[in-house]
Amino acid sequence: MATLFIADLHLCVEEPAITAGFLRFLAGEARKADALYILGDLFEAWIGDDDPNPLHRQMAAAIKAVSDSGVPCYFIHGNRDFLLGKRFARESGMTLLPEEKVLELYGRRVLIMHGDTLCTDDAGYQAFRAKVHKPWLQTLFLALPLFVRKRIAARMRANSKEANSSKSLAIMDVNQNAVVSAMEKHQVQWLIHGHTHRPAVHELIANQQPAFRVVLGAWHTEGSMVKVTADDVELIHFPF
């Protein structure tokens, strides 16, 4: 058996091929797993569990079917869907996890996270993140009418796209010191995350020992997952 990890699907109605690929994954590979972990940015945007978007209901039902089949499903918030709440988690049968979680997997201690907190060189993003994660601001935003939230979210996405276009790729990648610090804080030799859309397996030194950072790919033209078994940790790409 295996434990599966995915991230950065950025599901939206404008990308039906990705949605179809995810549904096939849920109906196939995911049903064979010991557990499924979604490490953020499942959706391109999330403005509240009360959004009646049919795509959200469709995804909730599909994930719930996996959970009901006996495969526990877990979710860590990303930078796009950090407002996903308890209502959607309940409807989809997912367990919400904190932004950093250590798992004991087949004899390995593995730290999992979305990954945006590791991009400490991007000071502008980190300042923005600190603001939008304030509970009072989230409560205020979620109390606004849905049409207002949609407008604000659209404006924020446009601003983010414009800001990122002028940033270097290095700034938007993880900071190596932040990676080592997180792994040593949790005393782990394995880290799995998404966010950067740069799938790879990186070797490093943490806790004065060899360590590994596995980065999930985004679902653009193909799927990406990390498959952890008793024998191996594999980064796998597959057609939709």
Swiss-Prot record:
Keyword Oxidoreductase attached: no
EC number, as in UniProt: 3.6.1.54
Residues binding Mn(2+) 2: D41, N79, H114, H195
Pathway in which the depicted protein is active: Glycolipid biosynthesis; lipid IV(A) biosynthesis; lipid IV(A) from (3R)-3-hydroxytetradecanoyl-[acyl-carrier-protein] and UDP-N-acetyl-alpha-D-glucosamine: step 4/6
NCBIfam families: lipid_A_lpxH, PRK05340.1
Family recorded in the similarity comment: Belongs to the LpxH family.
Descriptive protein name: UDP-2,3-diacylglucosamine hydrolase
Organism encoding this protein: Escherichia coli (strain SMS-3-5 / SECEC)
Lineage of the species this protein comes from: Bacteria, Pseudomonadati, Pseudomonadota, Gammaproteobacteria, Enterobacterales
